[in-house]
């Protein structure tokens, strides 16, 4: 399915978007109904968990999902969204289609029914979400070794950096100080995958933690 835009511009806010995602995930047919369990927005993408139940109370049988104890199944859905000239639009995909966007929170993944096929697109999508969630959020002063050198716009590279910040107006923005040059660089979360904590700012104030980290290096 392609993009669908609401040219009446009735979607204007986060609350409007969430209400529309809820509506899109809530419907009833002749034999089944679907209802939203949880929705989370990450950047411009909405992730949803939707539960399917049979109207007659019997267990839902599905080729992709293991039926839950209450007879329902809960699947994941992804809604790409954007605004075009003031009009909000979306493109939706069910997890079994293997969406590229894979940053669903672990709290949402925990609501989904088990999958029958461990080699399915849905299983691979869930694993990508888990891998993303596993990337650490470093704290101010943490010294880090990236899994691979990052090439900067001037052609130089960096691999050992320290988490710090810079200010833009009243806001603090995360950046990293390069070990070799002292320069500052902004890094995407993806570039921190498989990185290693060399020393922690907390370790300086905690002899026990400092000893633990020293033993790892």
Tell me the role of every PLM-derived stretch.
Residues 86-133, 175-217:
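Intrinsically disordered, low-complexity, charged/polar segments
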Residues 153-190:
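Basic/aromatic-rich interaction segments and small domains that mediate binding to polyanionic partners
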Residues 1-31:
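Charged, amphipathic alpha-helical stretches
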Residues 31-45, 122-125, 131, 141-145:
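Short glycine-rich, low-complexity/disordered patches
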Residues 46-48, 142, 172-176:
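Short beta-strand micro-motifs in enzyme catalytic cores
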Residues 23-82, 150-167:
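Amphipathic, interaction-prone secondary-structure segments
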């Amino acid at each position: 399915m392609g993009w669908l835009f609401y040219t009446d511009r009735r979607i204007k806010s986060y609350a409007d978007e969430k209400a529309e995602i809820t509506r899109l995930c809530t419907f009833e047919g002749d034999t089944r109904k679907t209802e939203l369990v949880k929705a989370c927005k990450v950047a411009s993408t909405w992730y949803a968990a939707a539960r399917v139940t049979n109207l007659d109370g019997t267990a839902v049988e599905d080729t992709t999902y293991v039926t839950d104890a209450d007879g329902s199944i809960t699947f994941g859905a992804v809604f790409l969204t954007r605004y075009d000239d003031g009009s909000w639009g979306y493109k939706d995909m069910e997890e079994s289609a293997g969406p590229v966007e894979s940053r669903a929170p672990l709290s949402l993944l925990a609501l989904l029914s088990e999958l029958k096929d461990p080699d399915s697109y849905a299983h691979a999508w869930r694993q990508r979400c888990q891998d993303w969630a596993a990337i650490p959020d470093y704290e101010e002063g943490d010294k880090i070794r990236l899994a691979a050198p990052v090439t900067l716009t001037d052609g130089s590279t960096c691999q050992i950096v320290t988490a710090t910040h810079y200010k833009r107006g009243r806001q603090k923005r995360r950046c990293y100080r390069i070990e070799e040059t002292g320069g500052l660089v902004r890094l995407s979360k993806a570039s921190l995958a498989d990185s290693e904590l060399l020393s922690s700012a907390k370790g300086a104030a905690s002899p026990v933690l400092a000893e633990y980290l020293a033993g790892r290096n």
